[in-house]
């Protein structure tokens, strides 16, 4: 197990920003270095304790899916070794947890695909009979499989804020407003890119879910992010089908009517729900057993899905 990394301190490259989990550095005008830390957030608050190997799991799993799904849509990978773009004394910080990626313009939406009625979708369905405005058959139970996957985009929120579900029409409007000016002469436009993102996201989800089913895992839902290059070509960016962006259930314990256990930070959420805490920063420290169980769940998800061991 590698030494946990809460925050990278790369000095040889300019720091562009830090998200909930990832630190972003400029390599040059065309490329970025993405360092995936071991930070963990819950209820949109970054907690003070890192989860050992979490960043390595997320990076290895994303790389696995980028390779497996690359025939569906281009992705952000450059193939450049992250250790080659930092100083020699910084290589330990990036080893196994970093990617050198193309510098692309992100679409201003989260591309969420749902295959099951769970989470906020279950609450929405109970209240309205629909999820994000998409009408569904009556009488579905919690965690029921949908007749077919649905695309339910969300707005992108700043760190500490909540993403907001939006309609597909609103997603098209957002993409048109933010991207159309960048696409002059490219033969496409923002609204068309939103449609491309929807179609790509559903195709990615279906292929990944079919693969995962053969490994004994249900992918209940997932969130993709897309970006475009200067020619307006859509690329899969950020992370793909990790425990942070997806809801993974062990198939052998799945049944309708309950919220199944998942391969993610559920141990942390369950523990935090026992505290008198306002769910605002600063977050509380985690007990050692919660940290260990969460780390084990992340590693188990990677090993079961890929058939590989974390190097």
Curated annotation (Swiss-Prot):
Pathway, per UniProt?
Answer: Purine metabolism; IMP biosynthesis via de novo pathway; 5-amino-1-(5-phospho-D-ribosyl)imidazole-4-carboxamide from 5-amino-1-(5-phospho-D-ribosyl)imidazole-4-carboxylate: step 1/2
Supply the Gene3D superfamilies for this chain.
ATP-grasp fold, B domain, Phosphorylase Kinase, domain 1
Q: Which GO terms describe its molecular function?
A: ATP binding; phosphoribosylaminoimidazolesuccinocarboxamide synthase activity
EC category name: ligase
Question: Record's InterPro entries?
Answer: SAICAR_synt/ADE2_N (IPR028923), SAICAR_synth (IPR001636), SAICAR_synthetase_CS (IPR018236)
Which keywords appear in this protein's UniProt record, sorted alphabetically?
A: ATP-binding, Ligase, Nucleotide-binding, Purine biosynthesis
Q: What GO cellular-component annotations does this UniProt entry give?
A: cytoplasm
- Which PANTHER family does this one have? PHOSPHORIBOSYLAMINOIMIDAZOLE-SUCCINOCARBOXAMIDE SYNTHASE
Recorded protein name is Phosphoribosylaminoimidazole-succinocarboxamide synthase
Organism equals Aromatoleum aromaticum (strain DSM 19018 / LMG 30748 / EbN1)
